[in-house]
From Swiss-Prot:
Pathway, per record: Carbohydrate metabolism; tricarboxylic acid cycle; succinate from succinyl-CoA (ligase route): step 1/1
InterPro entries from the UniProt entry: Cit_synth/succinyl-CoA_lig_AS, Citrt_syn/SCS-alpha_CS, CoA-bd, CoA_lig_alpha, NAD(P)-bd_dom_sf, SUCC_ACL_C, Succinyl-CoA_synth-like
PANTHER family referenced in this protein's UniProt entry, alphabetically: SUCCINATE--COA LIGASE [ADP_GDP-FORMING] SUBUNIT ALPHA, MITOCHONDRIAL, SUCCINYL-COA LIGASE SUBUNIT ALPHA
EC id: 6.2.1.5
Family: Belongs to the succinate/malate CoA ligase alpha subunit family.
Annotated gene: ALPHA-SCS1
Natural source organism: Trichomonas vaginalis
Reaction(s) catalysed by this chain's protein: succinate + ATP + CoA = succinyl-CoA + ADP + phosphate
Main localization of the protein described in the UniProt heading: other
Disulfide cross-links: none
Protein's recorded name: Succinate--CoA ligase [ADP-forming] subunit alpha-1, mitochondrial
Protein localization: Hydrogenosome lumen
NCBIfam families: PRK05678.1, sucCoAalpha
Functional description taken from the UniProt entry: Succinyl-CoA synthetase functions in the citric acid cycle (TCA), coupling the hydrolysis of succinyl-CoA to the synthesis of ATP and thus represents the only step of substrate-level phosphorylation in the TCA. The alpha subunit of the enzyme binds the substrates coenzyme A and phosphate, while succinate binding and nucleotide specificity is provided by the beta subunit.
Length: 309
């Protein structure tokens, strides 16, 4: 359906990562060290880290390089995971993109919105894909590859693609699909900030084009129009005639004008409500799970109805 959308990026994995993804860590403090170890234990190829003052040393079993250009030259890294604190995170994203990274995953929260506008401009100019900021990352059980802080024990290789603004609801959906025997193809936490890199539509398009992904769970939050935009694309392409989609939106009871956890989770001017998102998604043929505990049950029922299990 969508091969043309990605024809210019044939050298990049359709679902962002694969078994050959080589990862560099930017921000090798306590959290960077801890999660780099977990990533390697899972099977991810973490090839080094960047710290301008500690180049030439070994930290947490990783060789340390002075800058991103050096690490790319020495290791052929093609993806970066950023744990740099908020004041320097935008500069780290830009450095990674300009060094030729195909993918940047930014875990950092509280990056100024003005900084993120600059980051998104550079990402567009370089063709680098940004996931985040303020996200848990992504995981691909079939290749044992993950970038981020996602716990691995609840995932199993399978058929369902999950895209989510909420970290914890990502894990809820993953565990439910594992228990249902469906498993996951790739799971992407896009983050809850107003200026996120990948939005729901960007990821859903990739799931639609991926033959292993046979069903999709979309998890949104109040605020913004990412979910409505995805609903418009799903309706336009009649995606639900080919692959079932189940959606759940967090924040249905949030009072207008009050931020709920994530910087982007705020209803203002009568826009971004949970009901508005549900209405748009339902009109596109998406099955709605108003309680997140039903996500696994509903996607199982939809997969069975369409003869996919």
């Amino acid at each position: 359906m969508l091969a043309g959308d990605f024809s210019r990026n044939l050298h990049k994995p359709l679902l962002f990562i694969d078994k050959d993804t080589k990862v560099v860590i930017q921000g090798i403090g306590n959290q960077g060290q801890f999660h780099s170890r977990l990533m390697r234990q899972y099977g991810t190829k973490v090839v080094g880290a960047v710290h301008p003052k500690k180049a030439g040393t070994i930290i947490a079993g990783l060789p340390i390089f002075k800058n991103m250009k050096e690490v790319v030259k020495r290791t052929d890294a093609n993806a970066s995971l950023i744990f740099v604190p908020a004041p320097g995170a935008a500069a780290a994203c830009i450095e990674a993109a300009e060094a030729g990274m195909g993918l940047v995953v930014c875990i950092t929260e509280h990056i100024p919105q003005h900084d993120m506008i600059k980051v998104k401009k550079v990402m567009k100019e370089t063709g680098c894909q940004l996931i985040g900021p303020n996200c848990p990352g992504l995981i691909q059980p079939g290749t044992h590859t993950k970038l981020g802080i996602i716990p691995t024990n609840i995932f199993n290789n399978g058929k369902i693609g999950i895209v989510s603004r909420s970290g914890t609801l990502t894990y809820e959906a993953a565990y439910a699909t594992t228990l249902a025997g469906l498993g996951q193809s790739t799971v992407v936490g896009i983050g809850g900030d107003p200026f996120a890199g990948q939005l729901h539509t960007d990821v859903v398009k990739r799931f639609a084009a991926d033959p292993q992904t046979e069903g999709i769970i979309l998890i949104g939050e109040i605020g913004g129009t990412s979910e409505e935009d995805a609903a418009e694309w799903i309706a336009k392409t009649k995606l639900t005639q080919e692959k079932p989609v189940v959606a759940s939106i967090a924040g249905a009871t949030a009072p207008p004008g009050k931020r709920m956890g994530h910087a982007g989770a705020i209803v203002s001017g009568g826009k971004g409500t949970a009901e508005g998102k549900y209405k748009a998604l339902e009109a596109a043929g998406v099955r709605i799970a108003r309680h997140p505990g039903n996500m696994g049950k509903f996607i199982f029922e939809e997969m069975k109805r369409m003869g996919k299990i």
